[in-house]
Regions:
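Short, charged, intrinsically disordered terminal tails
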Residues: 179-191
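Structural signal for interior beta-strand "rungs" in well-ordered beta-sheet cores
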Residues: 1-171, 176-177
């Protein structure tokens, strides 16, 4: 079923039971299988499998929504973002280069570039929760299972292995060190 005013561009593949709301734009090279897309939503060059996408949400380009993913309304799932068996609540954003696996992400959460939910330990998968309003900085690893509290702020480059309290700033990274003359002593980059 395709709603009134929806535009579907060439090279789009719709498989199985697909429902697309009104006034959507489905861009070229998109594949949607057994999924529901809300109203006024834009999907650009992406793959959506057995998932739900809310109203006024933007997906892509080059996003991958794997089975059992649910994206709320007013969300952004940008380029090279993969979401698996997870929920992004209303207003959440994962703009680029992010992996969200087996997790629940609250309302108006911002996931910075390069955020990875580390959900698999080699034998079991674990689930994490990020509460409403949290800000997760660029290149953060959330080693599941962890719980990030409401309005918490996780600093860029951190690896999170413990829960983060509501409203807290969490920084987990080593102090940088510059070793002068190291390149020359090792003979690296000789011209």
């Amino acid at each position: 079923r395709i709603g009134k005013g929806t535009v579907i561009y060439p090279c789009v593949v719709l498989e199985g039971d697909v429902e697309i709301g009104e006034n959507c734009t489905i861009g070229q090279n998109t594949r949607i299988k057994d999924s529901i897309i809300g109203n006024d939503t834009s999907i650009q060059s992406s793959v959506i499998l057995e998932s739900k996408v809310g109203n006024e949400t933007s997906v892509g380009p080059f996003a991958y929504l794997r089975p059992n993913s649910e994206i709320g309304s007013h969300c952004k799932v940008g380029d090279f973002v993969e979401i698996k068996n997870s929920r992004l609540d209303d207003g959440a954003k994962a703009a680029h280069l992010t992996y969200v696996g087996d997790s629940d992400v609250g309302k108006k959460v911002n996931l910075g570039c390069g955020v990875v939910f580390v959900n698999y330990d080699g034998s079991k998968k674990y689930r994490s929760v990020v509460e409403d309003g949290a800000f997760i900085g660029c290149n953060v690893n959330l080693v599941s299972p962890v719980h990030v509290g409401k309005d918490a702020y996780v600093a860029a480059g951190s690896t999170i292995t413990n829960d983060v309290e509501d409203g807290a700033l969490y920084v987990a990274r080593s102090k940088g060190k510059s070793i002068e003359g190291w390149v020359e002593k090792r003979g690296i980059l000789k011209k």
